[in-house]
Amino acid sequence: MSLDMKEHPDAEVQKNRVLTLEDWKDKWVTRHISFHQEQGHQLLKKHLDTFLKGQSGLRVFFPLCGKAVEMKWFADRGHTVVGVEISEIGIREFFAEQNLSYTEEPLAEIAGAKVFKSSSGSISLYCCSIFDLPRANIGKFDRIWDRGALVAINPGDHDRYADIILSLLRKEFQYLMAVLSYDPTKHAGPPFYVPSAELKRLFGTKCSMQCLEEVDALEERHKAWGLDYLFEKLYLLTEK
């Protein structure tokens, strides 16, 4: 069944659902991190050349990065990676699992926040809320890889999120995003259901949107949530 047939009219059902930053920190403490992909994201791997366009020395942003292994992929290719993640556990595990030495220091601009930097200087991970991140003046980016980010943001915060993302984009950017489609009356989220109409509303004025691929992503754990279908859709957003 195609995704378009499954554009659910009940997207509103999730609009008041809220997870706090503490809720997300607790997921790392209690190891409820089934969202982490140890082998990396296969659609990103498949479309990596399209995303990078053969360019070198790019700045790549990972919103809500967790311990995504893809950050190492980009750094190994000579790019500079910046991520933001609320869980210090996730950040420390990234460096440990990738065998990278790092430094950490408090961020003067944001109370309680820290920045963790690989000794090579190619990876900087900010431990704070993405909504506080603009105060750190992290600059602009050539590429953004958004997997498990927009779909993890409380639906009521979509506009704030989109404003921050758009503010981080350089000229001639490529913004690659993976979103999920399922019946939101059967699962409260996260990950949240983000219909294409919502993407257009959030990003359509500034970005051209192209769907690169749609795959059936239903796993046993999703069936346990009560879902009978789940599609993942990969979008490439570029400058209008």
UniProtKB/Swiss-Prot annotation:
Pfam families: TPMT (PF05724). It is found in: Cytoplasm. GO terms for molecular function: thiopurine S-methyltransferase activity. It is an enzyme of class 2 (transferase). GO terms for biological process: methylation. Catalyzes the S-methylation of thiopurine drugs such as 6-mercaptopurine (also called mercaptopurine, 6-MP or its brand name Purinethol) using S-adenosyl-L-methionine as the methyl donor. TPMT activity modulates the cytotoxic effects of thiopurine prodrugs. A natural substrate for this enzyme has yet to be identified. This is Thiopurine S-methyltransferase.
